[in-house]
Amino acid sequence: AALHRAGYANRAESVAPGDGLRLDDAYITAVVRCAPPANKPKVEERDNCLPYLLRELELLERCRTIVALGSFGWDGALRAARALGAEVPRPKPRFGHLAEADLGRWRLLGCFHPSQQNTFTGKLTVPMIDAAFDRARALTNSVSE
């Protein structure tokens, strides 16, 4: 629903493949491709999956904003950007909700991961998710103007 509210999706929910959901100016991917034990990905799994993320970013020529869900996604995006030649600031930008990092070609935006733990405890709320995708839209619009 958050992608729909921010104008990235043509409908608020999808219940089955082929049900008509369409993303506009958005692409969803993952730093880790497998379902890790206890839903806790390991650094080795992230590193093994890095080539897939690199290839996706290479193919997404129009991509200007990356929303990283969680610190694991943030670190994976920084690694991918560095591997593709981006000048990642030193010290490494710290993850936080609505944290931003300028990676040259991309603007990286942090958002707490929408896990059950984060949403049930209130660490991540609907207004916070909306703020992240609204900010992503603003960042994307500012670089494409």
Each PLM stretch: what is its role?
Residues 1-93, 97-142:
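A polyanion-binding, active-site-adjacent surface
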